[in-house]
Amino acid sequence: MTRLLAVIFLLGLVTVPASAISMKWKFSTQDSRDFARPDFDDSSWQEVAVGHKWKSAGFAWFRSSITIPDEIDGNPTIGQAVGLRWNACDGGECYVDGEVYTRYDNDHPALVVLSESAKPGELVHVAVRVFMGPDTAEHEGSLGQAELCIVDPKLVKDEFLVTIDPGKRLGPLPRSFAGLSQGAGLPDYDDATAAIFRSIGIKWFRMDNLLTNAVKKNDDGTLRYDWSDLDKRLDFMKKVGCELIFCISYMPEPFDAVPNPERHSYPRDWNEFGELVYQAAKHCVDRGTPVKYWEVWNEFNTGWMVDPAGWDHLKTYTTLYDVCWKAVRKADPTAWVGGPAIASGPWNENDPRGPGVNGEEFMRGLMEHCEKTGAPLDFITWHEYFQPHSIMKKEAEQIKEYLNDYPKVKKQVKEYAVTEWSYAWWHDRAHDNEIGAAWAATSMLRGWMAAGVQKPCWFLAKDFSSGLQGEWGMFTRENKPKPVANVCRMFNSMMPIRIECKGEDEQIASIASLDPDSGRVTVLIVNFAERYGPPRKIRLSAMNLPSSLDNGVCRQYLVDATHANLWHDPARCELSVVREVPIVSANAFDTLVELSNNSVMLIEMGGNSGP
């Protein structure tokens, strides 16, 4: 799948151009994990090279026994870190000498370090299982890249220092990775599902499609309200212990002005639709489950909505917004109303600042409308998928810049909410493995948290289909945690007070926090590269630890290619301690860890219970 996307190139990763040495690979469209074994007999397989194209379903395999050459592009390899840069199909997993080394997708290609200190003539057995797509259909595939390179030794061999100082407190730690989003409702609303969401720390939950089935026809043709679906969701939120972000959508079929099976017609009668919204908000209050957050519609800027004759999308949206906020505030004067829930960033098409689809038109359009009319805008919402963390941070900053032109609205806005965000808007194997999890951690630390976004909502909460099919869910249909769910748990297991934490480069991001009462300290470290990420050696050094940590213990929890990873091992998909290190003295403590690319580690010092 080819995707034109903004990417960050990891500066300094490869210091020597990639080798043009012709490499031969054995290839098969069959699938067996035995193919990763160095001693597997592949003599009957087809021999191919870069540029090979084929069509198949499921998975395909490449194998090669690579001999380290004397030189790569005229540079001696002896003693150098020698790597293989690889990209093929939608993604895949790379094996070195029979063991999983790394996974990749085609927008985040792999770097396989064959040797940290190469010896010419050294033989390394490499196998790659490539993903042909998350479904059972046939897809076209190609071997796009397989080339040797010399890797910057500073990245592979040298220790990267992360320092923390609990004596320097920076205020409350933002609890940003505590929201979910689900379109079209959950597959179920049972107690077990509520319990798993509660256990990982979910505090807000955005849902759309809440009004689609709220109006029913009686046998005599009259209409009635049906709150059964809404009640089910409200009761579920209470069991989870979280706030509902009520996305006012979609149009009930009896209210259509024009037939539209996608439920995106404007209403036949604006007052009639306003009464529905009022009754929904009043119903929430009357049953003792008032809703604080009311978001007006979903991705209106994409052009899905059918407009009244002679109207443009923005006029239709601001009219709908007025109908909704007046209805909600009539039922509950304390409720918050927000929008515009745009798809993609706050820019229009072909804007050099970033991606978007009528984004600036709708973002500014709503702000200007509220500035002129006095309509409330309590929180601002938008959606984003896949973009690098730098783009995500820039989006939030751009929206705040727009607000400077609307001073009355700026005073109203209390929060920013990305009511849908995820690794990709398409089905992708990265949703099921550690790539999506590490991307999410990086996006959270360097994107949303860095920009002050209070309420990101991960899309999707739970898969609709059984098994692993590349769907967006944080959990499978069977309530098994994917790696991203374990990363969410890591974030919500951190202590409440942020402390000084230094240690960041293009790949590594980190954050630390303290519980002043117990003295427990937590550190979260992410290794994620947009392209060609090597493993990194991380030295964590702590000073001024609380005295209660004398003779304590440092516990390490890990999400990577082989740990807490449902894709790799369904029997060991839960987050667990991978290593314990004694803390002899709180005066000074350090520990060395090695993090592969696409990995997230939570380090907990002190305390007897884990996440």
How does the language model describe each region?
Residues V285, L540, L545-L595:
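Acidic, Ser/Thr/Pro-rich beta/coil linker or hinge segments at domain junctions
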Residues F62, D505-G552, Q556-H563, N598-G606:
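Carbohydrate-binding surface patches
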Residues A36, W45, I66, I72-G98, ...:
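Aromatic-lined ligand-binding clefts that engage carbohydrates, nucleic acids, or primary amines
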Residues V156-F197, G201-K203, D208:
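Boundary/entry segment of secreted carbohydrate-active catalytic domains
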Residues I21-R37, V48-H52, A118-L161:
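An acidic-aromatic loop/edge-strand motif
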Residues D378-A430, S443, V453-Q454:
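Glycoside hydrolase catalytic-domain groove-lining segments
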Residues E420-R520, L524-F528:
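Aromatic/acidic polysaccharide-binding cleft in carbohydrate-active enzymes
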Residues I200-H389:
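Substrate-binding cleft and catalytic face of glycoside hydrolase catalytic domains
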